[in-house]
Amino acid sequence: MTSRYKLTLSYDGHDFHGFQSQPGQRTIQGTVEEILKQMTKGQEVRVFGSGRTDAGVHSVGQVIHFDYPGREIPAANMIKALNSQLPMDMVFTDCEIVDKDFHSRFSVKGKWYRYRVSLDGFVNPFKRFYTGHYPYPVDVEKMQEAAKDLLGRHDFTSFAASGGQIEDKVRDMYYVNVALDEENNEVIMDFIATGFLYNMVRILVATLLEIGNGRRPVHDLKRVIAAKNRLEVQQTAQACGLYLYHVFYEEVPRKYRLDLDL
């Protein structure tokens, strides 16, 4: 007999070799599975995530699930037991017991990624692991105008890095927001879609920054999307500025879907 637990996890991805377990590497999945193994006195408990973040990518809202053997432990006790053993660069923020038909990956309705990019002339030592860096002038209004071209249903082949295993490249992009944080001299970019291809957000960020810098026309994204060719976009933003912000398991709220008829 097992009980299925759904947990929300925040982590500083700097010192992890990504989410997925890899022999000899420190990973998110491997760290949680090792703690569960200790809690079950040696039993293997498989952890499933909503997605596999790369090395250096952070999370505010990663969601995992696992089936815990033996007697059911109250959710409040489970999160306390796990957090008491986690390293300081990880913390569970929510826990609930769910039905067995819930799956952290296959039940997803949408994902929200946020990217922070510092516009400082030189790399800020206190930001270097938590923001991307773009030391060139950008016109945020141009980036905001360009971002509108991403909304809707598109084939995002041009923004998928090699190495991905998903053949269907069509995604519904519900929401894109580009904002200037003047106090911290950063550009904050938010993306909400039904899902994202391998490195898609980082490639989109790099392309929007090129538009902001005048290296591409404002509406060049339309051409790049239509081309369905990865060679149209050569740059990929650094992993350190990317955050998995939220995972939706109900329909994405209308306030994030604007007037899209999707």
From Swiss-Prot:
Catalytic activity: uridine(38/39/40) in tRNA = pseudouridine(38/39/40) in tRNA
Nucleotide-binding as UniProt keyword: no
Pfam families the UniProt entry points to: PseudoU_synth_1 (PF01416)
EC number, as in UniProt: 5.4.99.12
Keywords: Isomerase, tRNA processing
GO BP terms: tRNA pseudouridine synthesis
Taxonomic superkingdom: Bacteria
One GO MF term attached to the UniProt entry: tRNA pseudouridine(38-40) synthase activity
Residues the entry annotates as binding substrate: 113
Record-annotated active site: 54 (nucleophile)
Family affiliation: Belongs to the tRNA pseudouridine synthase TruA family.
UniProt cross-references to NCBIfam families, sorted A to Z: hisT_truA
Assembly and interaction partners: Homodimer.
Role, per record: Formation of pseudouridine at positions 38, 39 and 40 in the anticodon stem and loop of transfer RNAs.
Protein name, entry field: tRNA pseudouridine synthase A
